[in-house]
């Protein structure tokens, strides 16, 4: 059976078969609409962004100027700043030190692993923007506080607010959002702190609170090495 007529018929019915002239015109029109689409940003309005960084904005402009693919440039412009635009809550803590609570996507809780990964791309820019550096320090300090509070928890609330998992069969406290122990929850804060120190040379994060958190981490790792 000759399938060629069937294929042609299907192409015609689907609108895929057209003259060279109409195809060229369609391509030009499509390219125009695509270019227009990529000129529109999906970032929140400036007044609604949770945190602003001149260094991040400068990096976006730099990378966009080097990209010839409009879609890639548009994706970078919208994706790279998304964490600071929509999830970072920076303030001064009760001790006067930097404190940053980072939402994990649309969940109003902070995962130790996820928050470390979310802000990781910005560490390279820390020396170019003091506000950004302070925000990153705040993430590290908040992670240390969380670990000291409960090294077996993987996600925390922004204060003792409780949550939907309070009835889980484990030792839940109102500050904890979720208590599902993961080894990477304790590794990612160390990774972030080390990279921050390598880039900035700021050793102020390695204070008594750091030592207490490290003791908690080591004790937890040793406990989880048990055989029974």
What are these regions (language model features)?
Residues 9, 21-24:
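Cleavable N-terminal signal peptides
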Residues 13, 53, 69, 129, ...:
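Polar helix-capping/helix-linker motif
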Residues 13-14, 104, 200:
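Feature targets compositionally biased, intrinsically disordered low-complexity regions
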Residues 108-136, 140-228:
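Aromatic-rich carbohydrate-recognition surfaces in CAZymes
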């Amino acid at each position: 059976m000759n399938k060629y007529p069937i294929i042609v018929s299907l192409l015609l019915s689907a609108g895929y078969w057209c003259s060279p002239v109409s195809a060229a015109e369609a391509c030009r029109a499509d390219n125009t609409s695509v270019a227009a689409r990529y000129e529109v940003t999906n970032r929140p309005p400036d007044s609604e962004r949770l945190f602003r960084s001149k260094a991040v904005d400068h990096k976006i402009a730099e990378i966009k100027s080097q990209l010839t693919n409009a879609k890639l440039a548009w994706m970078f412009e919208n994706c790279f700043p998304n964490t600071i635009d929509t999830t970072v809550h920076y303030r001064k803590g009760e001790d006067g030190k930097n404190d940053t609570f980072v939402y994990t996507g649309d969940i109003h809780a902070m995962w130790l692993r996820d928050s470390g990964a979310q802000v990781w791309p910005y560490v390279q820019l820390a020396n170019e923007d003091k506000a950004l550096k302070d925000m990153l320090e705040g993430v590290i300090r908040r992670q240390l506080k969380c670990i000291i509070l409960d090294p077996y928890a993987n996600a925390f609330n922004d204060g003792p607010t409780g949550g939907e998992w309070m009835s889980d069969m484990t030792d839940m406290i109102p500050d904890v959002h979720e208590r599902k122990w993961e080894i990477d929850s304790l590794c990612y804060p160390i990774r972030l702190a080390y990279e921050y120190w390598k880039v900035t040379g700021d050793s102020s994060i390695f204070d008594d609170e750091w030592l207490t958190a490290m003791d908690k981490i080591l004790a937890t790792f040793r406990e989880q090495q048990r055989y029974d």
